[in-house]
Curated annotation (Swiss-Prot):
Residues 1-24 form the signal peptide. This is Metabotropic glutamate receptor-like protein L. The gene is far1. Residues 669-681 have a biased composition (Polar residues). The chain crosses the membrane at residues 371-391, 402-422, 436-456, 480-500, 532-552, 569-589, 598-618. Residues 25-370, 423-435, 501-531, 590-597 are extracellular. It is found in: Membrane. Keywords: G-protein coupled receptor, Glycoprotein, Membrane, Receptor, Signal, Transducer, Transmembrane, Transmembrane helix. Glycans are attached at residues 21, 235, 310, 366, 527. It is a multi-pass membrane protein. Disulfide bonds: none annotated. It holds the Pfam family Bmp. PROSITE patterns: G_PROTEIN_RECEP_F3_4.
């Protein structure tokens, strides 16, 4: 019995010991985001290959998402991976373009592990479960440059160039060429570099490759993500290096002298293992290089001498041992990455860009608007001359005042100038800024002076009705200006902010409005602040129109001939408001910049030109053809009792007749009317109602009768 108990205790202790040494692995659900397609035989292929090897090692399936090449697509894809019933707990990115989105969403998911690709620099990870990985950007090109130096060939290299990528790849390659000690009598290798401002643009890479092929260059290399330039050299029976992480000899054979292969399985497996074993290192950072087997060389081409192979392997061993032969002249690795100039000895072939052609398909439309705007300015000038020199003493002009008439013409002319600038072909910053100023100030003057005078007329009319005062006098121009100054200040402040903070300017827009990729049109642009200020300016003018419609509705009851222009003002305001609604409706469905400019120009010309014709056309028509008797009957008033003081119809008529006579003398016309005198109760007074309500027309008829 004791033996049985002893054996049971021993068995229990053994089980406890065994269980205590068994690790409780955590389930791993990996997901990888690629910037491009998995089958590109480049960086995306190698990243996916590293994930596939990691899957085999940990025996866990993973998910791969292609084309996560923007902030929004990266953020949305990661969020969908984490908001599932069985969420992924290890998210891996593969491009620096995905870094910002991954860091942002990682701050909201502190229980999820992230392995983010890229150089963090001064950025901080949001929590301890966020790790990073990157690789040496210099050592691979240094090693390939060493091989090129040993071959003694002329090499051409295509790089993005600053500001897309500094010249550290070209300088590292050239440093490797010089690091090789050529034997006596061996040819000196050379390096020529062309920049394209892009990692993967096919057209610019092709153009850069053509430049290198015309320079009697034997071998090409590059720091781009595809093999466009290499293919051009291989098709021309020349040779190339593989630099995008894929073992290019698998495709092109011995025509690829050597490739530096990226082994992404190393960081992926290390991160997945830490998640499984729950041994994640805070601040985990992997920096790939030859010393941790992230980089390794592909098969050598038969073109490489065996001695050079051995020398290259010795160089790799030196780097694995911790040496950094690519660091010269006391520069640190970080300083090498900051090099914006090519090293002395490199032939700089400059930047290549695909030639662009300007497209100008709206020439006839623009010329038409420019001609109409010039015509509008000319008509405004002619009207101003006529008002000043021919009708300055006409009562229709006197009640408007000459300065007011000229100010209305000035506002319309400023709008015409804006439309002229809007349709110029050759643009610059000054033109782009000036057209906004002219349009805003023009409408501010035109609308502002109309609504202010309409308001003053309405207030004066209400005061006359309230006080029963029949004395009528023109609205002083100075009073209108005083009311307009605040509107002008607001407009100028907004325009100054737009000019200083909105950064308006001209840009050559490639491929805009359906034209070719390398065709461009000149357009005016501004930044986000400029857009906001423009919207505020539009709201400002919209409020002016809204108030104008209200005051126009109120002035409909004014029947005094001296203030009849208030009805013309109302028509002008309604017209501008209608055009504004038309612009909004048309602009909603229009995406073409040229079509938008056409709509703006047409509505601006129509509204401003029509306002001038409405306001001054009515005035000139009354001057040219005074209103005749409208056929109203001569009403004989019955005898009324005479009251003390001024009263009764006779006095009222007499007062009105005196005022009419004064108006006639002011306009240079001698009045032939006289006020009837009040007699006894039996006297009969006969008046013409038209003389009472329309004194200007009465004086005009009197002048016509005298002429006869």
């Amino acid at each position: 019995m004791k033996l049985i108990i002893k054996n049971l205790i021993l068995l229990l202790v053994s089980c406890l010991y065994f269980l205590s040494n068994v690790s409780c692995d955590q389930e791993v659900h990996m997901a990888l985001l690629l910037e491009g397609q998995v089958d590109d035989l480049g960086i995306n292929y190698e990243v996916n290959q590293g994930l596939a090897e990691t899957e085999a090692l940990i025996q866990r399936a993973a998910k791969v998402i292609n084309d996560a090449n923007s902030y929004d697509s990266t953020y949305d894809n990661i969020k969908s991976l984490l908001d599932q019933d069985n969420p992924y707990n290890l998210i891996i990115t593969s491009s620096e373009s995905q870094m910002s989105a991954a860091l942002d969403i990682a701050s909201d998911y502190e229980d999820t592990y992230f392995l983010i690709f890229g150089d963090m620099g001064d950025k901080k990870v949001p929590h301890s479960k966020v790790g990073t990985y990157y690789f040496n950007l210099v050592s691979p090109h240094f090693v390939l440059g060493f091989i090129a130096g040993g071959m003694g060939k002329s090499v051409g290299m295509v790089v993005p160039g600053p500001p897309t990528e500094n010249y550290f790849t070209a300088n590292a390659f050239y440093a490797g060429m010089k690091y090789y000690t050529s034997p006596a009598g061996a040819p000196n290798p050379s390096l020529s570099v062309v920049a394209t401002s892009s990692y993967d643009d096919y057209d610019t890479a092709t153009g850069a490759g053509r430049i290198l092929l015309t320079k009697d260059i034997d071998i090409c290399t590059q720091s781009q993500t595809d093999m466009t330039v290499a293919n051009m050299f291989l098709n021309a029976s020349k040779w190339a290096f593989g630099t995008n992480g894929f073992p290019q000899s698998n495709i092109y054979g011995n025509r690829i002298i050597q490739s530096v292969v990226h082994n992404f399985q190393v960081p992926f497996y290390e991160a997945a293992t830490m998640v499984m074993k729950n041994t994640w290192k805070n601040g985990y950072n992997f920096f790939g290089d030859f010393n941790n087997n992230f980089f390794y060389l592909d098969y050598y081409s038969f073109l490489v001498d065996p001695l050079l192979k051995n020398q290259t392997e010795d160089l790799i061993s030196t780097i694995k041992g911790g040496a950094k032969p690519y660091i010269t002249n006391g520069l640190t690795y970080e300083k090498i990455l900051e090099q914006t100039k090519l090293s002395t000895g490199i032939t700089d072939l400059g930047y290549y860009a695909v030639p662009t052609t300007e497209v100008y398909t709206t020439g006839s439309i623009n010329k038409t608007f420019m001609a109409v705007s010039i015509l509008e300015m000319a008509i405004c000038l002619i009207i101003g001359i006529i008002v000043i020199f021919f009708f300055s003493r006409n009562i229709n002009i006197i009640y408007s005042t000459i300065p007011y008439c000229l100010t209305i013409l000035l506002g319309a002319s400023l709008i015409a100038v804006a439309i002229f600038l809007w349709n110029l072909r050759d643009l610059n910053t000054q033109i782009c800024t000036s057209k906004i100023w002219m349009a805003s100030l023009g409408y501010n003057v035109l609308i502002g002076f109309i609504i202010i005078k309409s308001s003053l007329i309405y207030f004066k009319f209400k005061e006359m009705v309230k006080s029963k005062n029949e004395k009528i006098s023109p609205i002083p121009f100075g009073r209108i200006v005083l009311w307009f100054v605040p509107l002008l200040i607001i407009d100028c402040v907004l325009l100054i902010i737009y000019s200083t903070s909105g950064n308006p300017g001209k840009i050559d827009s490639l491929g805009l409005d359906g034209i070719g990729r390398y065709e461009y049109t000149q357009n005016c642009v501004n930044n986000l602040t400029g857009d906001i200020i423009l919207y505020i300016i539009l709201v400002f003018h919209g409020l002016q129109l809204l108030y104008g419609c209200v005051i126009a509705w109120k002035t409909r009851v004014i029947d005094l001939e001296e203030f009849i222009e208030a009805h013309d003002f109302a028509t002008a305001i309604y017209l501008i408001t209608f055009c504004s609604f038309i612009i909004v409706i048309l602009m909603v469905g229009v995406t073409s910049t040229s079509n938008r400019n056409t709509i703006i120009s047409a509505c601006a010309i129509f509204s401003s030109f029509s306002c001038v014709l409405i306001i001054f056309g009515a005035k000139f028509w009354k001057i040219y053809k005074p209103v005749e008797d409208d056929g109203l009957p001569q009403i004989k008033l019955k005898p009324q009792k005479s009251y003390s003081g001024s009263g009764g119809s006779g006095n009222s008529s007499g007062s009105k007749s005196k005022k009419t006579s004064a108006h006639s003398s002011t306009s240079g016309v001698k009045s032939g009317t006289s006020a009837p005198t009040q007699t006894s109760q039996s006297a009969m007074a006969s008046i013409n109602i038209q003389n009472f309500v329309n004194p200007i027309e009465a004086s005009s008829r009197a002048a016509a009768q005298n002429d006869n």
